[in-house]
């Protein structure tokens, strides 16, 4: 659990963020023969030949990583709260989470083969075009400088928890086959707010074709509450009811 007290993470980068226009420049980074195009970054990135994610060192390493992520998230949340930018930085993190959810982007920025200066350049371009808060941009540079950019997803999760606690916000994850209309999401959020009594409700959307149709709703501090309105569940129930595996047919 993230705490706002006794945080040790420093949020000062030794590098001053530079702003560039991502729409006019598309540099090609000559790092290997494996190339991919990131529409989010508007860049062609050359991937290192080997994946180099940070080793967690087992359960102890995972625990230490979780504690570090909590410290970074709490420090940033404390700073954002004091500057009245909690909502803005949370919106920034939604975009960052979407970017780093691409495994190729994550592996690229996690690789020690890629120069930190190159990572900062790309992050600077993404921050500029996305309109990030200065604190958000600086925070990403801090993670690059400290070789902990590979913790970004864990940090976002921890920050989200702290934000929800500070603002009495319920996070609702809605998964559907196709993108739902905004008024449908508003109706779902309103119902969850009635169920939980939360002051505010934030919705995140995911797409999952395996649901066939309909949607699922997950909420609660750890996502423990689950509402399944998908056709997939209905089909599974029907299949269970007509299972003939144990029936002996007369010959």
From Swiss-Prot:
Question: What InterPro entries has UniProt attached to this entry?
Answer: ATP_synth_OSCP/delta_N_sf, ATPase_OSCP/d_CS, ATPase_OSCP/dsu
Q: Name one GO molecular function term.
A: proton-transporting ATP synthase activity, rotational mechanism
The answer to whether the entry has keyword ATP-binding is no
List the subcellular locations.
Answer: Plastid, Chloroplast thylakoid membrane
Which portion of the chain is the transit peptide?
Answer: 1-64
Q: Which UniProt keywords apply?
A: ATP synthesis, CF(1), Chloroplast, Hydrogen ion transport, Ion transport, Membrane, Plastid, Thylakoid, Transit peptide, Transport
Q: Which GO terms describe its cellular component?
A: chloroplast thylakoid membrane; proton-transporting ATP synthase complex
Q: What binding partners and quaternary form does the record give?
A: F-type ATPases have 2 components, CF(1) - the catalytic core - and CF(0) - the membrane proton channel. CF(1) has five subunits: alpha(3), beta(3), gamma(1), delta(1), epsilon(1). CF(0) has three main subunits: a, b and c.
The family note in this entry says: Belongs to the ATPase delta chain family.
Instruction: Tell me which NCBIfam families the record gives.
Output: ATP_synt_delta
Protein name as annotated = ATP synthase delta chain, chloroplastic
**Species annotation:** Pisum sativum (Garden pea)
